[in-house]
Amino acid sequence: MTGSIRSKLSAIDVRQLGTVDYRTAWQLQRELADARVAGGADTLLLLEHPAVYTAGRRTETHERPIDGTPVVDTDRGGKITWHGPGQLVGYPIIGLAEPLDVVNYVRRLEESLIQVCADLGLHAGRVDGRSGVWLPGRPARKVAAIGVRVSRATTLHGFALNCDCDLAAFTAIVPCGISDAAVTSLSAELGRTVTVDEVRATVAAAVCAALDGVLPVGDRVPSHAVPSPL
């Protein structure tokens, strides 16, 4: 998995945004994807959302909020998750090189966030059969979720890194459809407040490095993580 996964050589346009409504950001992604297909730049959006539940194409009825809380149904992969204040969301709008390798792309996103955790002193990694970034334990704890879509060789949607968000928001759903694992945050793991602003620049640099092959993908599986199929 060395070398760039991108079809363009020019630098990724990193846009550090503030708090953006989910539907507004989704429309911006589509516009940037259209521009990328027409020959425009690769873009990385980094932002926060107001509190919202979003459901991927594989979400089942019993995984939705039991109290009837509204959910935005999306065209990304994966199942239901929560976005909100204290969570850094990243949307890479990237033209992928041929031959397309979506698994490779997801692994690079994971690697970038694993590196961010390492820079903060956390030994994170992967759990076999499950996307995202995990901390070891019984159960394993997910600190970052990933759900993507690739259309016309261009990526949409992306990742969400829990910094200092309210983890209680995840209790109303079955996060990512996984009932035998937990959700955590950088702040909960480190015992101090880790804000979104603290990690913005580090995340941007790591994602760009991973997509360009400067940060190689390693075989990082936390010890004591319990793999099980989706």
Curated annotation (Swiss-Prot):
It catalyses: octanoyl-[ACP] + L-lysyl-[protein] = N(6)-octanoyl-L-lysyl-[protein] + holo-[ACP] + H(+). GO terms for cellular component: cytoplasm; plasma membrane. This is Octanoyltransferase. Gene3D superfamilies: Bira Bifunctional Protein, Domain 2. The keyword Acyltransferase applies. It comes from Mycobacterium tuberculosis (strain ATCC 25618 / H37Rv). Its main location: cytoplasm. Belongs to the LipB family. Residues 38-215 form the BPL/LPL catalytic domain. The gene is lipB. GO terms for biological process: lipoate biosynthetic process; protein modification process. The record marks 142 as: Lowers pKa of active site Cys. The active site is at 176 (acyl-thioester intermediate). Substrate binds at residues 76-83, 145-147, 158-160. Changing residue 142 to S: Loss of activity. Monomer. Keywords: Acyltransferase, Cytoplasm, Transferase. It is found in: Cytoplasm. InterPro entries: aa-tRNA-synth_II/BPL/LPL, BPL_LPL_catalytic, Octanoyltransferase, Octanoyltransferase_CS. In the reaction, the free carboxyl group of octanoic acid is attached via an amide linkage to the epsilon-amino group of a specific lysine residue of lipoyl domains of lipoate-dependent enzymes. Catalyzes the transfer of endogenously produced octanoic acid from octanoyl-acyl-carrier-protein onto the lipoyl domains of lipoate-dependent enzymes. Lipoyl-ACP can also act as a substrate although octanoyl-ACP is likely to be the physiological substrate. Its EC number is 2.3.1.181. Transmembrane segments: none annotated. It holds the Pfam family LplA-B_cat.
